[in-house]
């Protein structure tokens, strides 16, 4: 193996740059030529390859986003997309590809692997919903950001006796809402994995009002419903008794300098991915379990969605 490439695909996540940095520097140390593919699979199909040096990744440890850029690529869902991608990699004499992203990225990677390309996946998504790993790059930073948002909304909610409905990212799982809400002190956390009714949220608010609370914070994962819809329902069923606002942090949750935990996780996974390629272990994702790195087949990593820890959810309901 002499030439490898790395790409970031799908939604960006804090720590992707740290992973790219580790891949490049570990690859160069092993005597490899390392290329970045700009804008993920879209850039792969367009031939946007760029050789990287040790200096070119200097400073990436601290940077949010992705210096080599991300994109979603619908063509990878079509039969011709992965075949064309594999042909381009072969013509470029790329001996191995490292993909950093979430479930969509790994589905594309698996299809390219089936065309004969050695591939390693590194989980980079703020959703933390990839089977086979307990943590994904970017999740810790996004949790910090979301809890930061909730803490500041609490200040104004308390000052004005308001109820805030905060909408967190998470289409299929509620990991971000659960961790961010628990750390931020949300009164109610609504996630896709747990059926809920608006009446339950209102009952919690009324109970807290009887206890003397004058403000309330409800966190809802986007996959569990829309904040604006819950605001409308509560306004309709409280007859103006509550002053209610919706707050949608949106893509703020994706941004910012990665936390120390994300930087270290990304660096470890990047190094492990290069080692696995060199040792011939491919069509796998690098995951983490009990603090140790593990190797999981891409087939397993794309098999469904990792659901929340229900014991932790019960704790969130209690405290």
Question: Which role does the model predict for each range below?
Answer:
Residues 99-101, 107, 111, 139-246:
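Accessory alpha-helical/coil subdomains and C-terminal extensions
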Residues 3-10, 66-71, 96-99, 164-167, ...:
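Short glycine-rich or small-residue beta-strand-to-loop segments that form or flank ligand, phosphate
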Residues 44-99, 105, 137-148:
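Glycine-rich oxoanion-binding loops at beta->alpha junctions
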Residues 18-23, 104-117, 177:
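Short Gly/Thr/Asp-enriched flexible loops that form oxyanion-binding sites at enzyme active sites
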């Amino acid at each position: 193996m002499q030439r490898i490439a790395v790409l970031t695909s799908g939604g960006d996540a804090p720590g992707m740059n740290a992973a790219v940095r580790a891949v490049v520097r570990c690859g160069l140390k092993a005597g490899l030529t390392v290329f970045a593919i700009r804008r993920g699979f879209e850039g792969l199909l367009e031939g946007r390859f760029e050789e990287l040096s040790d200096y070119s990744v200097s400073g990436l440890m601290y940077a949010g986003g992705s210096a080599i850029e991300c994109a979603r690529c619908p063509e990878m869902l079509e039969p011709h997309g992965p075949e064309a991608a594999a042909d381009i990699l072969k013509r470029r004499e790329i001996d191995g590809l490292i993909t950093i992203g979430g479930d969509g990225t790994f589905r594309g990677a698996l299809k390219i692997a089936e065309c004969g390309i050695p591939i390693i996946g590194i989980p980079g998504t703020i959703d933390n919903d990839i089977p086979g790993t307990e943590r994904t790059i970017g999740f810790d930073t996004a949790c910090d950001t979301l809890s930061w948002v909730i803490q500041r909304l609490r200040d104004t909610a308390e000052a004005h006796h308001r109820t805030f409905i905060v909408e967190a990212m998470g289409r299929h799982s509620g990991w971000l809402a659960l961790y961010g809400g628990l750390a931020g002190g949300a009164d109610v956390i609504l996630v896709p994995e747990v059926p809920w009714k608006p009446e339950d949220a209102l009952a919690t608010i009324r109970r807290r009002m009887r206890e003397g609370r004058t403000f309330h914070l409800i966190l809802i994962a986007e996959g569990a419903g829309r904040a604006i819809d819950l605001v409308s329902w509560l306004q309709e069923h409280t007859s103006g008794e509550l002053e209610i606002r919706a707050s949608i942090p949106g893509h703020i949750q994706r941004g910012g300098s990665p936390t120390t935990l994300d930087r270290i996780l990304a660096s470890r996974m990047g190094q492990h991915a290069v080692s696995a390629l060199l040792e011939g272990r491919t069509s796998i994702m690098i995951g983490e379990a009990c603090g140790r790195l593990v190797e999981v087949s891409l087939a397993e990593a794309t098999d469904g969605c990792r659901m929340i820890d229900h014991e932790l959810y019960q704790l969130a309901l209690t405290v």
